[in-house]
Amino acid sequence: MSKPGLREHTNFANDVKVYGPIGEQRLKEILTEKGHNFEDVSDIEEFRIFDIDILQYNNDETNSEKVLDAYYMGKTTSAADAVAYEVKTDTYGIVSRNIVFEDLSNSNSGCMARTKADYLFYVFVNKQNEIVEEYLINVKKLRWWLMSNFGKINQCDYLQSRSMRRGQDNTGIFLINIDHLINDKTSGALKLK
């Protein structure tokens, strides 16, 4: 029996294509409302390897090449006068109350472990594809929080590890309770909606 608001089956590759744009569009709306200059780089291959979807520029210039140059030189987006966002749209989080931190994917670093984004914009959507909750999470602080709580994995209710197999892909994830994360001021997580 399925839980209310939860789809019974999931297809990860399809979910990224179907649900991913919902969160990306919402972040673009927020940046537009705030008058920020930004660029959607989610379809640019060079940014996919860094798991970056949207660049917000701190001036009137949009120059994704400058950002790429900074990354390849081992610098951060601040060197390119930009802020980078990774967007996650989650159809299960409204029920589980967890965000997913993918640490391992197909024997490589998972997207959350390797992202060069400054912020994670994480949204929970319901069965009707409506955004129910929005979070902005500082990626560096989240990683620090995870390392600080590493000894508590699977020994508390707010941090669990799982391994999954999707076809040939072996995936290692951490399930982090979003409510706990929001209440822990060291986590870098902020609830927007």
Q: Which sequence ranges carry the predicted segments?
A:
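Acidic-basic catalytic patches of nuclease active cores, encompassing PD-(D/E)XK
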Residues: M1-N59, T91-Y92
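Non-catalytic C-terminal interaction segments of nucleic acid-processing enzymes
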Residues: K3, N11, E33, Y57, ...
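Catalytic cores of nucleic-acid endonucleases
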Residues: T10-N14, E39-D40, F47, K88-E134
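Conserved catalytic cores of phosphodiester-cleaving nucleases, focusing on short active-site segments
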Residues: L31, I54, A70-G93
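Short, solvent-exposed secondary-structure boundary motifs
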Residues: L55-T62, E102-N106
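Short, conserved, surface-exposed binding loops centered on an aromatic residue
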Residues: T62, Y71-T77, G110-R114
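Beta-rich catalytic cores
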Residues: K66
